[in-house]
Each structure stands twice: as structure tokens, then as C-alpha cells.
Amino acid sequence: YLLLLCLPLTLMGTGAVPPGPSIEIHPRIVGGWECDKHSQPWQALLTFTNGLDGVCGGVLVHPQWVLTAAHCIGDNYKIKLGLHDRFSKDDPFQEFQVSASFPHPSYNMRLLKLLLSDELNDTYYDEISLGADFSHDLMMMQLEKPVQLNDAVQVLDLPTQEPQVGSKCHASGWGSMDPYSRNFPRTGKLQCVDLTLMSNNECSRSHIFKITDDMLCAGHIKGRKDTCGGDSGGPLICDGVFQGTTSWGSYPCGKPRTPGVYVKIFSHVDWIREIIATHS
């Protein structure tokens, strides 16, 4: 998730935030369980080369391309694949430098930079809070070389049709398990959480930001289960099909009747394929 309004510019996409209003785009798994080892072989972990670990998730959509959230944009990333326990020295994984990044051209980077700036005042706050549109929160990241596909590292196919409201979904990530934490202590082992796809109309009644046709909403009426700080860019899989990536949500995570918001991948399939075809 993007903890909307709170990420400092130097930690874009990390989920580390100073105190601020409770308008948030965050990333983390709350109310889930430890995924079976390598049951999500397309799951990627974005890390900084300076040692800051676990800033965002991602999805392997091609042997040399990872899809993540545009709000995770930053410099000097490494990407880990085939990882389960990020604290284990015995957990084998593949690690790659990022050779190029391509945020979606329609994502509102100006709004993101404004959100993360030190100049946030009442005027800017109104601009952000009143129907701000964070659609197209996607970024393609090209790896320095293709991955080696095996049982722990696999490409996740793009969807061929939209999901239906009520679909049973699950999300995964190494994000925070504490819905109230603003420092996002992250889990060591990959977590999964089951979610239900909810209607965008219902979702729009729960959030002050704009809910568009290029977004999906997933959660539970009673709350308690959600993605959260650190899970941004990770996959949402509905009825066995890749349908979304974690984008933003409320604070605290897992509030009743307040589903998390995901990018609708079906709306962006052509763009994803175009990036791969043009730059591979």
C-alpha cells in the first residue's frame, strides 16, 4: 500500500512514515497466514542496494520483467525472486539489478511528489484529499538478465477477462502485520491473506480518494484482513487468475467495510505487453 500522505521522499515506497493525517496509501498483510513455501513463485521483493530491505513487492510477468506499483519508484533497486524467508541465510533466491524502470505514463507523479513533499499545507491537502485520483499505479522494471525458471521462480500469466464481484481472492507480501504501525515492521516469511472482491460503488463510499474503473477493491465487511505497509506492488489473485496489484488503502489497515484498493490488471494488459515488446 502507499501510505498516502506520509511517505518521506527519501523513502518512496518504503512505507516508513512520519506522523500525519490518516490518509494513506500503505502496504502490508494483516490477518493472514504464512504462505506455503514457494506457493507464490511469481512473488518479487524490491530492495535498495544500500541495504534497506523489503520496500515493496512485485510480480514476475515475463522472464526479464517485474510489475510493481508506480509509487514504489526509486533509484538503485535490486529485485529478489524465489524468496520465502527474507531473514534466512539458507533460503536460496535469485537477485537482479534493475536495468530500466517504466512507470505508467498516466500515473499522477505530480500528486505523489506533492504528497511526499515537505511543503504540504491546507491548500495542497485539499487537492490531495478531495477525490484525488491514483489510477494506473503501475511500473514495469526490466531485470539486467532473464531469471532462471524453476519450482521457486515462475512467470504469472496476465488475465484474459475481468474478475467478478464476489470472487475469492488472495494477496501476498512481506509487509507489516500490525494494522496500526506507522513504522511498518515487516515479516520475515511471505504472508498470504484471503480477500473477497467488492464492488467499486461500495468501495467509493469508504474512501475519500477516487475509485475508478481501472481499480479493484478487495477485503471483508468485518475487516481484520488486508494488505498493508510494505505489500505494494504484490499480486492479487482471484479464482486462480492474476487480477490486481496492491496499491493503496486506509489507516489502520483492515478497517471494517473499508477494502484495500488494487490496480485492475485487465485494464493495463496492452500497456504491459507494449512495454515488453518495445524494450526487450
Swiss-Prot record:
Which Pfam families does the record associate with it? Answer: Trypsin (PF00089)
Q: Which GO molecular function entries does the Swiss-Prot or TrEMBL record give?
A: serine-type endopeptidase activity
Glycosylation sites noted in the Swiss-Prot or TrEMBL record: S99, N121
Q: Does the keyword Hydrolase apply?
A: yes
Q: Where is the active site?
A: H71, D137, S232
- Among the entry's GO cellular component annotations, what is one? extracellular region
Q: What is its EC number?
A: 3.4.21.-
**Record flagged with keyword Secreted:** yes
Q: What's known about how it's activated or inhibited?
A: Strongly inhibited by aprotinin, moderately inhibited by secretory leukoprotease inhibitor (SLPI), leupeptin, benzamidine, and phenylmethanesulfonyl fluoride (PMSF), weakly inhibited by urinary trypsin inhibitor, and Kunitz-type soybean trypsin inhibitor and not inhibited by EDTA and alpha-1 protease inhibitor.
- List the SUPFAM superfamilies: Trypsin-like serine proteases
Which N-terminal stretch is annotated as signal sequence?
Answer: 1-16
Tissue specificity, per the record, is: Submaxillary and sublingual salivary glands.
Q: How does activity depend on pH?
A: Optimum pH is 8.5.
Q: Which UniProt keywords apply?
A: Disulfide bond, Glycoprotein, Hydrolase, Protease, Secreted, Serine protease, Signal, Zymogen
Q: Propeptide residue ranges?
A: 17-28
Its annotated compartments are: Secreted
An individual GO BP term: zymogen activation
Report the superkingdom from the record. Answer: Eukaryota
Say what the protein does: A kallikrein-like protease. It preferentially converts human high-molecular-weight kininogen (HK) to bradykinin. Displays broad substrate specificity in vitro, with highest activity toward Boc-Val-Leu-Lys-MCA, Boc-Glu-Lys-Lys-MCA, Boc-Glu(OBzl)-Ala-Arg-MCA, Boc-Val-Pro-Arg-MCA, ZPhe-Arg-MCA and Pro-Phe-Arg-MCA. Has preference for Arg and Lys in position P1 and hydrophobic residues in position P2. Is not toxic to mice.
Protein name per the record? Blarinasin-1
Q: Which organism is it from?
A: Blarina brevicauda
